[in-house]
From Swiss-Prot:
Lineage: Eukaryota, Viridiplantae, Streptophyta, Embryophyta, Tracheophyta
Organism: Pinus strobus
Keyword ATP-binding recorded: yes
Oligomer and partners: Monomer.
Cysteine pairs bridged by disulfides in the record: none
One example GO MF annotation: phosphoglycerate kinase activity
Name used for this protein in its record: Putative phosphoglycerate kinase
EC number(s) reported in the record: 2.7.2.3
Length: 27
């Protein structure tokens, strides 16, 4: 369970980073 949660958190973090990059590029 802990490992699964960590993976989800990592994926979520990467998703947020991608969103930030997209926002910067769109500006």
């Amino acid at each position: 369970f802990a490992v699964g949660t960590e993976s989800i958190a990592k994926t979520f973090s990467e998703a947020l980073d991608t969103t930030k990059i997209s926002d910067v590029l769109s500006k």
